[in-house]
Amino acid sequence: MKRSKRYQSLCSLIEPKLYSPQEALKLLKKLATAKFVETAEAHIRLNLDPKYTDQQIRATVVLPHGTGKAIRIAVITKQSSHIEGADLVGSDDLCAQIAQSIINFDCLIATPDMMPTLAKLGKILGPRGLMPSPKSGTVTTNVAEAIQAFRRGQIEYRTDKTGIVHLAFGRMDFNEQHLYDNLVAIKESVETNKPSGASGLYWKSFAIATSMSPSIRLNIQQWS
């Protein structure tokens, strides 16, 4: 694929080496030259084969400084028609909207009693990464606590089919320290949630990029 002159110019700023996280974040700031506030992204390649269930990751992490993105939270429950902090609350009516692929939310939380109904909507919610799960904290009886966690900056992540984890860890108008703190939280969470089936070298590569830039590879041994 032919890259733009802008992209090629940014590539020329990146040396063929592994950067310390602090060096990488300083450089990342220089790469954020788009005319909008770009997202800071982490792309982590792990030595996992996700076709095996004991080599899959699906977990959550609370970013100390959040993602910088306002999210719309929907709750599916029969317990109440109004829940503080939720943008949408419903039960069968909200499920009917989802069945028609009407998705007006970024995060979906459900009470356990609604899961049999939601299971039928897996083909719609699954590909969008919106299917509630106990592992992600989105199937719970304590809905208020779950909402607060996501408002504080909790995000869900998982390995894709090739064993890579993709996450947003902030915006490029965050200062370097806040981006670093969020990045450390991600690394620690991925380490803590290492699957039982993982063997040998766990970390294959760890790269960061803006939404419009080439990636910078990190030396994951240099975390201070």
Curated annotation (Swiss-Prot):
Signal peptide: none annotated. InterPro entries: Ribosom_uL1_bac-type (IPR005878), Ribosomal_uL1 (IPR002143), Ribosomal_uL1-like (IPR023674), Ribosomal_uL1/biogenesis (IPR028364), Ribosomal_uL1_3-a/b-sand (IPR016095), Ribosomal_uL1_CS (IPR023673). One of its GO terms (biological process) is translation. It comes from the Eukaryota. The keyword Hydrolase does not apply. Its main location: plastid. Keywords: Chloroplast, Plastid, Ribonucleoprotein, Ribosomal protein, RNA-binding, rRNA-binding. It is found in: Plastid, Chloroplast. GO terms for molecular function: rRNA binding; structural constituent of ribosome. It holds the Pfam family Ribosomal_L1. PANTHER family: 54S RIBOSOMAL PROTEIN L1, MITOCHONDRIAL (PTHR36427), LARGE RIBOSOMAL SUBUNIT PROTEIN UL1M (PTHR36427:SF3). Part of the 50S ribosomal subunit. This is Large ribosomal subunit protein uL1c. The gene is rpl1.
